[in-house]
Curated annotation (Swiss-Prot):
Family: Belongs to the class-II fumarase/aspartase family. Fumarase subfamily.
Residues with site note (Important for catalytic activity): E361
Location, primary (coarse class): mitochondrion
Keywords (A to Z) from UniProt: Cytoplasm, DNA damage, DNA repair, Lyase, Mitochondrion, Nucleus, Transit peptide, Tricarboxylic acid cycle
Protein EC: 4.2.1.2
HAMAP family given in the database record: FumaraseC
Protein name (Swiss-Prot/TrEMBL): Fumarate hydratase, mitochondrial
Catalytic activity: (S)-malate = fumarate + H2O
Listed GO CC annotations: mitochondrial matrix; mitochondrion; nucleus
Record: active site: H218 (proton donor/acceptor), S348
Span of the transit peptide along the chain: 1-15
Annotated GO biological process: DNA damage response; double-strand break repair; fumarate metabolic process; malate metabolic process; tricarboxylic acid cycle
Length: 494
């Protein structure tokens, strides 16, 4: 009985993601189709979809991962920007304005996301992204045909290759769309999110500037600092992280468009590359420009590797910050307990009253994912052979995912954790006053060796540092009180 149930469950689990591939609410038996043709022949395509034969063929040939593995939406929107820009420029080179304007209108619908359901292809396809590029061409072609009152699938008066793809190749359009998508996401999502978190940490640094606590190195007691100083370190990490990300943009602004197949610009007109870059800059409001060397722009994606390297560094920073905060908030009674973190939800199904540092845990998992993505992008970026890198889809998938994860996690961490952090001043003071590392203040007065004897004696006998120092006869009570003052140990002396 159990075996039969398990078999049935496994069968259902295997098939559960197949039905969305129809992309229609109608049952398979009732769904209507139309004929579309590519160079391999005719194929039946769902009648309510704008894609054509090449997209349908890709759905059949690359049924890998299911709907969750589709090309990221920012890339599709970036393709809309590119196709609109190309149509604008191509009209100056002889493209029929009626056709060009219809392409622009259809591209606008790709840009605003209203056609996103017509882009079903997964990342796992040809490494140049040709299937997705043709998905874009077919959708824009059919939508433009519809706008002009024509018949879907007729390829007239708007042809997916001759008109939508005029003067373009997969090899230059896909890297162009990758750069546009990355830059738009960095500007519109990542930098604002990191800035919000940085500013919240900076506010906490100012709030905690008067609270003196014990420092820790090697997970052992060290000399004092203020809680504000500790948080200032986190603030500076993110300030540098934002600057690192911004520093990669100059290379991401360079666009491959105009290189066509191998970087030579075959089948384009002189000036096409620069004009398309100008049009993309106009549409997005961002300073895109044509790449100075199209051979590099097609064969290598070092700019994307560099950009994700900056994200990886940010992830390392966020991992350290989130871990520090949750360790400082450990307890509430048997941990460090120096910080009180916001209580957002119950923490345990078996331990009543338990509350966990969930925002810190979510952030550290995001960082782990980003670090993994960095490995994938590094491998992909190192594998461009001759005139073309053919790991493009996996690179942009991971880059866009990392940007989105870091951005969302930073906003969540700020709103649900950082702004609500409180200092447990009583616990902080208690821990600091028990620390033997305050003995460091005695170094200039009695020397390192004698100070070390004081610390070891206090630790061995379980006494206070002052009691040990007095029993050894190295100083008087008044001298100890004068020299061992935590508030005098948090900065350099004049």
């Amino acid at each position: 009985m159990l075996r039969a149930s398990a078999t049935r469950f496994l069968s259902q689990a295997k098939n559960m993601n197949n039905s969305p591939r129809l992309f229609s609410s109608a049952s398979a038996a009732l769904q209507k189709f139309r004929a579309e043709r590519d160079t391999f022949g005719d194929l039946q395509v769902p009648a309510d979809r704008y894609w054509g034969a090449q997209t349908q063929r890709s759905l059949q040939n690359f049924d890998i991962g299911g709907p969750t593995e589709r090309m990221p939406e920012p890339l599709i929107r970036a393709f809309g920007v590119l196709k609109k820009a190309a149509a604008t420029v191509n009209m100056t080179y002889g493209l029929d304005p009626k056709v060009g304007e219809a392409i622009q209108k259809a591209a606008d619908e790709v840009i605003d996301g209203s056609l996103i359901d017509h882009f079903p292809l997964v990342v796992w396809q040809t490494g140049s992204g040709t299937q997705t590029k043709m998905n874009v061409n077919e959708v824009i072609s059919n939508r433009a045909i519809e706008l002009l009152g024509g018949e879907l699938g007729s390829k007239a008066p708007v042809h997916p290759n001759d008109h939508v793809n005029m003067s373009q190749s997969s090899n230059d359009t896909f890297p162009t769309a990758m750069h546009v998508a990355a830059v738009v996401e960095i500007h519109g999502r990542l930098i604002p999110a990191l800035t919000t978190l940085r500013d919240a940490l900076q506010a906490k640094s100012a709030e905690f500037e008067h609270i003196i606590k014990i420092g820790r190195t090697h997970l052992q007691d060290a000399t004092p600092l203020t809680l504000g100083q500790e948080f200032s370190g986190y603030t500076q990490q993110l300030t540098y992280g934002i600057a690192r990300v911004q520093g990669t943009l100059e290379r991401l602004y360079n666009l491959a468009q105009g290189g066509t197949a191998v970087g030579t610009g075959l089948n384009t007109r002189k000036g096409f590359d620069a004009k398309v870059a100008e049009a993309i800059a106009s549409i997005t409001g961002l300073p895109f420009k044509t790449a100075p060397n199209k051979f590099e722009a097609l064969a290598a994606h070092d700019a994307l590797v560099e950009a994700h390297g900056a994200l990886n560094t940010v992830a390392c920073s966020l991992m350290k910050i989130a871990n520090d905060i949750r360790y400082l908030g450990s307890g509430p009674r048997c941990g460090l307990g120096e910080l009180s973190l916001p209580e957002n939800e119950p923490g345990s199904s078996i331990m009543p009253g338990k509350v966990n540092p969930t925002q810190c845990e979510a952030m550290t998992m995001v960082c782990a994912q980003v670090m993994g993505n960095n490995t994938a992008i590094s491998v992909a970026g190192s594998n461009g052979q001759f005139e073309l890198n053919v790991f493009k889809p996996v690179m942009i998938k991971n880059l866009i995912q990392s940007i989105r994860l870091i951005s969302d996690a930073s906003i969540s961490f700020t709103k649900n954790c950082v702004v609500g952090i409180e200092a447990n001043e009583k616990k902080i003071s208690s821990i600091m006053n028990e620390s033997l590392m305050l003995v460091t203040a005695l170094n200039p007065h009695i020397g390192y060796d004698k100070a070390a004897k004081c610390a070891k004696k206090a630790h061995k006998e379980g006494t206070t540092l002052k009691e040990a120092a007095l029993s050894l006869g190295y100083l008087t009570s008044e001298e100890f009180d004068q020299w061992v003052r935590p508030e005098d140990m948090i900065s350099a002396k004049d």
